[in-house]
């Protein structure tokens, strides 16, 4: 299950594998592993991805222990193949458009409906909120500055916004060394019209991805793999006079939904014009228009730089027993962000109707020049694992086994100094054994023993066992008559215990 946010450029998708299993939505997100390491999936260049595997039953996710309760999504990036260098280039252009936007009453319809409602409530003609001259001006559009009639959704929201994706890859190699390299560019424009003359107050997002994957056969039995990938990105957002609990984009749309069509005229000759309630109605005080939440408040620009690096050294141990091999793996992830905030205030104007019927614009408040503020964020984490794998066939009997130790530590800098951080650690021991007879009858036993620093001492470790049995019915002789339209049929039953450590960190200390 996937859902997207409202109109914000590059707003992260929300993905559920096993539905919402917690009161906290963020605690229901699946675990994403990119090349076996927990990393962000949503900012990968799709041209780097070889395949995606979704694990959701208890037997498949129990080995991930306290991280597997919400399912696991395994992402494998592309690797080079032996042969001449292959270069490919792809480009795509897309138009984003709102699927459906609400339609609003115009000023005349609004005023007539409001007055009629008051008449039904027993108001007299002289008690009605909208003056007759205002209603007539709404109908005839004789003075659109003093008596505005604005469709704010049409005025502020574009019909389309451009999105582009460009990518170039090169891959190949010899029998001993193989490589895959990729460069990608992603751009996304915002869906809002920009009326600010001095700076851009729309949304925009640019991302530049890079990747280099190497496979080196050191000997006939020893292989070294190295993956390096990352991205550089910048995101431009309008400065918003927001409300607690709402994102920028939600605040902007709330302003559009709540604004009346007669609350302002938008930008007139470079001036931001609100309506004067004294010309229209005694029942409406502050005539805030749909632009007040973001227009003239400045903008934010966030620059990000992320590096992902991992290596794997694998050794076949056939001299001990056929099918046995061992590997060690290490990974390092680093991210840095810099947010520059330029905040200010643009003055607004109100119409002043003169005795001769002409309209002048009167400035109501003062201008605040754009200020400057910076915020820096840093993050890094380490991951190591060591494992023994065994896989062997004995006639129609196929067995495999895995024993693995893994550990990770994540740093979250806090406070004004980037050197202040509170680490979060994870440690685990994994065991798995599988057996199948003639690729027909299956048995899978798993165990994860994990510890997480998100819990209090004495409560940090847990055992997560699981097992499954399966029967591939399509391999049976009695299924041959239906093989033409049912070539694969499998029955599987599994049971297991999984955990979730995505609670708020260190709540046991409060």
Which residues are covered by each model-predicted region?
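Outer-membrane beta-barrel transmembrane domain signature of Gram-negative proteins
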Residues: 148-171, 260-269, 344-444, 452-456, ...
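Solvent-exposed loop/turn elements at secondary-structure boundaries
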Residues: 414, 480-509
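Short loop/turn motifs that connect adjacent beta-strands in outer-membrane beta-barrel proteins
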Residues: 80-85, 175-176, 191, 221, ...
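Flexible loop and strand-edge segments within Gram-negative outer membrane beta-barrel domains
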Residues: 98-100, 144-184, 188-192, 201-287, ...
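Residues on the lipid-exposed face of transmembrane beta-strands in outer-membrane beta-barrel proteins
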Residues: 77, 89, 168-174, 212-216, ...
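Short, small/polar-rich motifs associated with maturation and membrane association
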Residues: 3-210, 224
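Flexible, surface-exposed loop regions and adjacent strand-edge segments
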Residues: 104-110, 197-201, 241-253, 341-353, ...
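Transmembrane beta-barrel strands of outer-membrane/channel proteins
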Residues: 87-95, 183-185, 226-232, 328-334, ...
């Amino acid at each position: 299950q996937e859902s997207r946010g409202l109109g914000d450029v590059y707003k992260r998708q929300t993905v559920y594998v096993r539905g919402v299993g917690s009161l906290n939505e963020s605690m229901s997100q699946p675990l994403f592993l990119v090349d076996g390491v927990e990393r962000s999936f949503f900012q990968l260049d799709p041209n780097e991805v070889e395949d995606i595997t979704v694990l959701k039953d208890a037997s498949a996710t129990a080995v991930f222990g306290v991280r597997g309760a919400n399912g696991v999504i395994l992402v494998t990036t592309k690797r080079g193949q032996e042969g001449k260098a292959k270069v490919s280039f792809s480009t795509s252009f897309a138009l984003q458009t709102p699927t459906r936007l609400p339609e609003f009453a115009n000023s005349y319809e609004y005023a007539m409906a409001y007055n009629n409602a008051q008449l039904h409530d027993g108001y007299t003609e002289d008690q009605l909120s909208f003056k007759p001259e205002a209603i007539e001006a709404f109908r005839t559009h004789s003075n659109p500055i003093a008596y505005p009639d604005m469709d704010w959704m049409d005025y502020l929201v574009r019909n389309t916004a451009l999105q582009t994706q460009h990518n170039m890859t090169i891959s190949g190699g010899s029998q001993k060394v193989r490589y895959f390299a990729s460069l990608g560019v992603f751009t996304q424009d915002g869906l809002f019209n920009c009326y600010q003359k001095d700076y851009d107050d729309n949304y925009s997002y640019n991302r530049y991805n890079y990747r280099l994957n190497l496979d080196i056969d050191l000997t006939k039995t020893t292989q070294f793999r190295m993956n390096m990938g990352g991205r550089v990105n910048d995101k431009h957002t309008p400065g918003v006079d927001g409300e607690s609990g709402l994102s920028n984009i939600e605040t902007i749309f709330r302003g559009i939904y709540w604004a009346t069509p007669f609350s302002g005229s938008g930008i007139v000759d470079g001036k931001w014009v609100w309506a004067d309630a004294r010309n229209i109605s005694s029942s409406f005080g502050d005539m805030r228009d749909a632009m007040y939440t973001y227009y003239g408040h400045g903008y934010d620009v966030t620059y990000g730089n992320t590096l992902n690096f991992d290596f794997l050294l694998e050794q076949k141990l056939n001299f001990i027993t056929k099918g046995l091999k061992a590997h060690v793996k290490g990974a390092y992830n680093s991210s840095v962000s810099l947010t520059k905030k330029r905040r200010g205030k643009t003055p607004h104007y109100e119409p002043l109707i003169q005795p001769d019927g002409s309209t002048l614009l009167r400035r109501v408040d003062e201008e605040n020049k754009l200020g400057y503020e910076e915020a820096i964020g840093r993050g890094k984490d380490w991951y190591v694992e060591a494992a023994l794998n065994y896989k062997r066939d004995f006639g129609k009997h196929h067995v495999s086994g895995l024993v693995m130790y893994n550990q990770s530590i994540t740093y979250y800098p806090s406070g004004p100094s980037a050197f202040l951080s509170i680490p979060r650690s994870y440690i685990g021991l994994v065991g798995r054994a599988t057996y199948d007879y003639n690729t027909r009858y299956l048995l899978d036993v798993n165990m994860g023993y994990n510890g997480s620093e998100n819990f209090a001492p004495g409560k940090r470790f847990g055992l997560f066992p699981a097992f499954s049995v399966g029967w591939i019915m399509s391999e049976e002789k009695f299924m041959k008559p239906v093989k033409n339209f049912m070539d694969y049929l499998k029955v599987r039953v599994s049971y297991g215990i999984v955990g979730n450590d995505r609670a708020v960190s260190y709540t046991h200390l409060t």
